[in-house]
Amino acid sequence: MKLPIYLDYAATTPVDPRVAEKMMQHMTMDGVFGNPASRSHRYGWQAEEAVDVARNQVADLINADHREIVFTSGATESSNLAIKGIAHFYHKKGKHIITSKTEHKATLDTCRQLEREGYEVTYLVPDANGIIPMERLEAAMRDDTILVSIMHVNNEIGVIHDINAIGELCRSKGIFFHMDAAQSAGKIPIDVQTTKVDLISISGHKMYGPKGIGALYVRRKPRIRLESQMHGGGHERGMRSGTLATHQIVGLGEAAAVAKQDMAADSARITHLRDKLWNGIKHIEETYINGDMEQRYSGIFNVSFNFVEGESLMMALKDLAVSSGSACTSASLEPSYVLRALGLNDEMAHSSIRFSIGRFTTDEEIDHAIKTITESIDKLREMSPLWEMFKDGIDLEQVQWAHH
């Protein structure tokens, strides 16, 4: 067993060996290394063919048409292109956008930029379970609302939004629906034929593909128009210029094909391991799962251990690669904005750890994790005066702390 044990699959995944092998065939002189836009010789034709195969593989994963897939550098770029692209193209129709406070920074920061450009954004607050109620979403809709951007699976707490209901509501109001599927694509089924979603952000490195590659699904019927954010060459039907990274795209395509093939088996294994982990630590006093218990993806599991500092816990769990929030924000000592939006106080938000389980996690690793977590919590609480006061029956909410 390799230490530290990797339990941070929501931050990134290792490239599946089947994907890496396929990518290696598209990098060197002996492989298919040409520029897919080179139409005058075989090197270009072969590269274009490899890109076409990958485009079909990504489309198959979500039951889309291959012409609806636009390759990007990742889900962050996809979300930027989707949100800004819609806002800029349809600005005469309206300048109001709806999103939620628990979205990824790729969505939130893009919306903040649009606010600086004169757009209005409504940031919905979820219920304590992390889910946006449909009536709250509908109440926020206005005549000038052009876009709703809600993530499928939350990257910190793993809750799943009802995208079918959101899609139906948006379509009935003539509002475009963008979905950030960075954490869900390749892990839970997505079918664009039955779900009325117009734009989907997809990430390669969250589904055992390479970093630096992603895709944006752009619906053709009814047709969605975007204003390009990257100019120079008119690649990807004018939506995203730049030489196509053949080996990366092939990697994304193969990752999508493997994910589709292994999805049911992966899901069953990951659910088993998540249940095993929770059953092994739920006896620890003052331990709480964050987010809805039912409507969730089993691979992301966020737990608060009351009366323990998250940072000290992470130091104690040095044998486990885990995070105290999303990788994009765990470098900050601020409590998770996602957990704060759920109504958790600073102490509970600070004492939370995100465990994310993936394709290569083993039973042995989970056993070791349970032992490490249990021992670390006991040790840290032994040193905690707050824990001692709590055990003595003192209501810490009522304590008046002296300021120095």
Curated annotation (Swiss-Prot):
GO annotation, cellular component aspect: L-cysteine desulfurase complex
Catalytic residues as annotated in Swiss-Prot or TrEMBL: C328
Pathway of action: Cofactor biosynthesis; iron-sulfur cluster biosynthesis
Cofactor(s) needed by this chain: pyridoxal 5'-phosphate
GO biological process, one term: [2Fe-2S] cluster assembly
Coiled coil feature spans: none
Keyword line: 2Fe-2S, Cytoplasm, Iron, Iron-sulfur, Metal-binding, Pyridoxal phosphate, Transferase
Major subcellular site: cytoplasm
InterPro entries, per database record: Aminotrans_V_dom (IPR000192), Aminotrans_V_PyrdxlP_BS (IPR020578), Cys_deSase_IscS (IPR010240), Cysteine_dSase (IPR016454), PyrdxlP-dep_Trfase (IPR015424), PyrdxlP-dep_Trfase_major (IPR015421), PyrdxlP-dep_Trfase_small (IPR015422)
Keyword Cell membrane: no
NCBIfam families per UniProt: IscS, PRK02948.1, PRK14012.1
UniProt name for this protein: Cysteine desulfurase IscS
Species this chain originates from: Shewanella frigidimarina (strain NCIMB 400)
